Structures are given as structure tokens and as C-alpha cells.
């Protein structure tokens, strides 16, 4: 006998919705803090006990809720943020579905105190979604929500929660992202009475970065911005020398909402291409403004994922913005000082200040270093404006004048070699200090730029082979190469069918290394076969990297002084001389000041 279809009760419906909206304590914090942001709050306090399993309290100074709307707020799909279907496609708030409050209330004990500041306030208490009490409350403008005994009526959910430190880490990550998205709001977060995050809400994104990631990271960040007809981007990108082993430090914010978008992350990584080692990822915060009509935020239960109608154009704008911003700078990292030296530097008290708006007389670089010790973090949570200095960095502007670009064309100074260590590292000097150059990485960068340009030219100047090369392949690889013949021709490999599962090659580009033609051809074909589908851009890029790596001098290769001079002079002509194509540093500098400090010539 068929089962009858019945309509679920509101209580059961809310519990089902809670399964998507309220996965863990961090979900509760996210939804309630976003409500506080939507209410126009300028200060939000987040008080958490036992990683949110015991109690979560959110206090804001927002607009509050009218007395007659308080109970309605806990009905499913009751909201003040959208009124009709058209509003759904122009969402200006973080929340809009009306699911959060009833979902949270259905799996917890919840007390809400709220007031618009014009009349007496209202207090309402719920247990498992049922209203227990509603009465008059305080008249302070704003809202305070206390959530306790989370998941008391869904014990199965408790089994799948992680350890308290992990759950606390999830909460902290959510609040960090919200603080980065809203630097104009003061966030004050504490756990078991211990302050963990505090921002001052003055609108300065770099100070928020300092509060979250530390002042040393903020000092290594440069402002970036770009604009098109559809998008306006601003934010801070941290120099490539400071990187992480995962993508967790990439923050993309669209219209005030932190989102996860693989295409935008790829675009950011493309902007850092050849500046970061393989497996390393940047620290970057981008705030993107666009018309809500071209972004759909109603595609994910937690609203973390969005759909963009012009995703490709936005990605290209981001990549070019990052590339151009770093192309204006000298990216020679400072040499590491010893742990003891760092401890001595930390013991010194220094006075530092922001100099964001001061324009330098000369094009700013990261090469120069102020004659001051390292910053010492204080016990305070919020870094104040006079707590640290940030060197003035150029902001990317697509309309940069050609004259300015030309002035910055020489990206590293003249260096004079003085010797070689372990037949691997070149030592050089000038008036600025000591330089250590990885000879393989240096030539790899030079050859990469040469091959990348040659491969991109698609020249038809060919050298005939005295003995044509016949290559045989398994049938599956033969079929794939048939499909990729046009792409291979774009990088100088001309395959002709020659019997079953075979190709013949009769010529190659004139710029192929002499006596290594067959090896290069096979390497390029292997690159094409290494991925099921490869774009011509990716094939050219991978081919240039492969050729530059294999054809550069290696470690344990002795060089004459003339060889070293020639290598360094050629390196100065490279467009990006600071890293090899794999992102490893080419050159490290010890300034004269740092050396004198190490030898106690200056104190």
C-alpha cells in the first residue's frame, strides 16, 4: 500500500533547514554576525564559550527589531531584506532567505533582546524553536542574541563535530573573513573571556590585515586596484616572498560577502605565476564591487559560492592587476638573520608610523630598507596607527603613464661578482650590500623569457633535419596527438602521419638548441600528452618552463669571473629577474646595514 504524502510540521521543517544552515557553531556565528552587519552595526561583540558549544553571544548596535516583528522573525522565510522576486536578483544584504533565526532556534536555547532605541525593547526566549516567553526588555538600541545548548535535541549532530580547538578555529576563520570584508565595522571577539580579535572599524583594510595576520605581513603588503565597466577591485597583495602552503589566505570578497570561487583563485594564482614556488600560495585580500544583477548569491546553503555572469573578464582583470603591480617593484628578498639576532632586535623599542599618503620623490621600491630594527608586537590586540610603518607602495592603475613605466624598467642594480660558493651560488656586491645569486635559477629565468617569446612568435623559419625523426606511439596516445596537432604546430612541432600509429618530423624551428633537437621534440610531445586537455597558452607556458630548466647550467658547475659577469648582466635585462619560472628566488640581498649590525658595527 502506498504511503500517504503529508505536509511536514514547521518544527520539523526548521530542523531539516538547520541541517544545511547550521552545521556547526561557526555556522551560528556567521549567520548572526551577518544579521548584525545587515542591521547597520558599527560595533559587533562576539562572546563564545567552549568553542560555541556552551554559549554564543552576539551584541550589536544596529537598527534593532520592532516589538511586533520579534516573534515573526522566527517564522521560516520571514525577512525584511527582500519583498519580491525582483529583489532576489539584486541582493544588497548578506542574508535574505529568512532561514537563519528559525533554524538556529530549532536546535538550541535562544534568547534575543532587541530595541530600535525609540521605545522600550523586547526580550524573547525560545527552546527548540518554541517560544517560551516574550516580555519587555532594555531600551538600548541594537540586538543581543544568546545561543546556548546548541544541538541539544539533535545529538547525532554533536557526534560529527570536531575537537574544541578545531571548532574554535572555524569560528575564528569566519570572523577573520567578515572583518576583512568590513573594515568599517569594529569586531571584538573573545573566547572564554580571552580576547582573540579586535579591529577598530576605521575603514583601513591594512590595519585589519595587521590585526589578523600580524604587522609583519601587513608591512609586506602592497595596495592593488583595478577598474572596468563592470568591476571595481581594491585590496592588498602580500609580496611573493611571504607565502603559505594552502589557499586559506586567499580572500575574495564580492559586494561585502566573502565567497569561494575556484576561477577567481586560479586568476589570482595566475597573477603570481613564476613568482611563487610550486605548492605555495599567496596571501591576498581583494574587495570586488559589481552590480548585483551580474552575481547570483542564491546557489549555496551558506551563500559561500556564487555564480558570476562575467567570470572570465573578472579573472583576467585580477590577473593583470597583480602582474602589473609586482612588475613595478624590486622583489629581492632580504637575507634571513639568525634567531639570536631576531631576539636581540625584538628587545629594542621603536616608534613607527603609517606613511600611506606620503608620495616618495623617487619611484618606490622594496629594495631599500629603513635603518630601523624589526617591529616588536605589543600585548595589545589592535595595532594602532603609530605602532608600525609601511613603506609606500605603488597602487596598480591601468592608466599608468608610459614615462613612469620606463623609469622603472631596470629592476635590479648593477652587481659585481666576487666569487662562487660550492659551484652553485654567485656572490656579488655593490654599494647597497651583498648579493647571493642561484646560478641555475638565474639562467633558468633568462632562458624561460627567451623561449617564451620564441614559442609565442609561431615563426615558420624551419631547419630541415638531415635524418627525419619517426616516432611511434600506443594507439591511445596517437589519437590524442592527432587531436593536438594544431596546438603542437603552435610551439614548433610539425607532425606528419607516417604509417600506423606513427608520425614523422622533417623540420624544427631554427631556435631549437643545436644537437638537442630530437630530445626537445620528444619533451614537448610528452608535455602535450601529460594532460587530457591542454590549451595552447598552457602548452606554450609548460614548454618554455621545461626547456629553460633542462637547458640551464646546474649546481656544481664552476664559472669563470667572465661567465658570472655575463650572467648577471643578462639577468638585469630580464623582465622579471627575481624568481625562476617555478617561483624559487633567484637573488637574495644582505644590505650593508644588516651586515654591519650582525658584526656589531652599529647598534
UniProtKB/Swiss-Prot annotation:
Q: Which residue intervals are annotated with compositional bias (Basic and acidic residues) in the record?
A: 336-346
Alphabetic keyword roster: DNA damage, DNA repair
Q: Name one GO cellular component term.
A: mismatch repair complex
Q: What is one process in the GO biological process aspect for this record?
A: mismatch repair
State the function annotated in the UniProt record. Answer: This protein is involved in the repair of mismatches in DNA. It is required for dam-dependent methyl-directed DNA mismatch repair. May act as a 'molecular matchmaker', a protein that promotes the formation of a stable complex between two or more DNA-binding proteins in an ATP-dependent manner without itself being part of a final effector complex.
User: What family classification does the UniProt entry report for this protein?
Assistant: Belongs to the DNA mismatch repair MutL/HexB family.
Q: What is this protein called?
A: DNA mismatch repair protein MutL
Organism field: Listeria innocua serovar 6a (strain ATCC BAA-680 / CLIP 11262)
Amino acid at each position: 500500500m502506498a504511503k500517504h504524502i503529508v505536509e511536514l510540521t514547521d518544527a520539523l521543517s526548521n530542523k531539516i533547514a538547520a541541517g544545511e544552515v547550521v552545521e556547526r557553531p561557526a555556522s551560528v556565528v556567521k549567520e548572526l554576525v551577518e544579521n548584525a552587519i545587515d542591521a547597520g552595526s558599527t560595533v559587533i561583540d562576539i562572546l563564545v564559550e567552549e568553542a560555541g558549544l556552551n554559549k554564543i553571544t552576539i551584541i550589536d548596535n544596529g537598527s534593532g527589531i520592532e516589538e511586533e516583528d520579534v516573534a515573526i522573525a522566527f517564522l521560516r522565510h520571514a525577512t525584511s531584506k527582500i519583498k519580491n522576486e525582483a529583489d532576489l536578483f539584486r541582493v544588497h544584504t548578506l542574508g535574505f532567505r529568512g532561514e537563519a533565526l528559525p533554524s538556529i532556534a530549532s536546535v538550541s536555547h535562544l534568547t534575543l533582546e532587541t530595541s530600535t532605541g525609540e521605545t522600550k525593547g523586547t526580550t524573547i526566549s525560545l527552546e527548540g524553536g518554541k517560544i517560551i516567553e516574550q516580555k519587555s526588555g532594555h531600551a538600548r538600541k541594537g540586538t543581543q542574541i544568546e545561543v546556548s545548548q546548541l544541538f541539544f535535541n539533535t545529538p547525532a549532530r554533536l557526534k560529527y563535530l570536531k575537537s574544541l580547538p578545531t571548532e574554535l578555529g572555524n569560528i575564528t576563520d569566519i570572523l577573520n573573513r567578515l572583518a576583512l570584508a568590513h573594515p568599517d565595522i569594529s569586531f571584538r571577539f573573545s573566547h572564554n573571556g580571552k580576547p582573540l580579535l579586535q579591529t577598530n572599524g576605521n575603514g583601513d583594510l591594512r590595519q585589519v590585515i595587521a590585526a589578523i595576520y600580524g604587522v609583519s605581513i601587513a608591512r609586506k603588503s602592497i595596495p592593488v586596484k583595478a577598474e572596468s565597466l563592470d568591476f571595481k577591485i581594491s585590496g592588498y597583495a602580500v609580496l611573493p616572498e611571504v607565502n603559505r602552503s594552502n589557499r586559506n589566505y586567499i580572500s575574495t570578497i564580492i559586494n561585502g560577502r566573502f565567497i569561494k570561487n575556484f576561477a577567481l583563485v586560479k586568476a589570482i594564482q595566475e597573477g603570481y605565476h613564476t613568482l611563487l614556488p610550486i605548492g605555495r600560495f599567496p596571501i591576498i585580500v581583494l574587495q570586488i564591487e559589481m552590480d548585483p544583477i551580474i552575481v547570483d548569491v542564491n546557489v549555496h546553503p551558506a551563500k559561500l559560492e556564487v555564480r558570476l555572469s562575467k567570470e572570465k573578464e573578472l579573472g583576467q582583470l585580477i590577473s593583470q592587476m597583480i602582474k602589473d603591480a609586482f612588475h613595478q617593484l624590486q622583489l629581492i628578498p632580504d637575507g634571513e638573520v639568525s634567531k639570536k639576532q631576531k631576539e636581540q632586535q625584538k628587545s629594542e623599542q621603536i616608534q613607527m608610523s603609517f606613511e600611506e599618503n606620503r608620495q616618495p620623490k623617487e619611484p618606490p621600491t622594496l629594495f631599500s630598507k629603513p635603518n630601523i630594527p624589526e617591529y616588536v608586537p605589543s600585548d595589545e590586540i589592535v595595532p594602532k596607527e603609530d605602532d608600525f610603518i609601511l613603506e609606500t607602495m605603488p597602487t596598480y592603475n591601468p592608466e599608468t603613464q608610459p614615462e613612469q613605466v620606463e623609469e622603472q624598467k631596470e629592476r635590479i642594480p648593477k652587481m659585481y661578482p666576487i666569487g662562487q660558493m660550492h659551484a652553485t651560488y654567485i656572490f656579488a656586491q655593490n654599494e647597497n650590500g651583498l648579493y647571493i645569486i642561484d646560478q641555475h635559477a638565474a639562467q633558468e629565468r633568462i632562458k624561460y623569457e627567451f623561449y617564451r617569446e620564441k614559442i609565442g612568435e609561431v615563426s615558420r623559419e624551419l631547419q630541415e633535419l638531415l635524418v627525419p625523426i619517426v616516432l611511434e606511439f600506443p594507439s591511445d596516445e596517437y589519437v590524442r596527438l592527432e587531436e593536438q596537432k594544431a596546438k603542437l604546430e603552435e610551439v614548433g612541432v610539425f607532425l606528419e602521419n607516417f604509417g600506423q600509429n606513427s608520425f614523422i618530423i622533417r623540420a624544427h624551428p631554427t631556435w631549437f638548441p643545436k644537437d638537442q633537437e630530437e630530445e626537445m621534440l620528444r619533451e614537448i610531445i610528452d608535455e602535450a600528452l601529460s594532460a587530457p586537455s591542454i590549451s595552447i597558452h598552457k602548452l606554450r607556458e609548460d614548454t618554455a618552463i621545461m626547456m629553460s630548466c633542462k637547458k640551464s647550467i646546474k649546481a656544481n658547475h664552476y664559472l669563470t669571473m667572465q661567465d658570472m659577469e655575463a650572467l648577471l648582466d643578462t639577468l638585469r635585462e630580464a623582465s622579471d629577474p627575481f624568481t625562476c619560472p617555478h617561483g624559487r628566488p633567484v637573488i637574495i640581498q644582505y644590505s650593508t646595514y644588516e651586515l654591519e649590525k650582525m658584526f656589531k658595527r652599529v647598534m
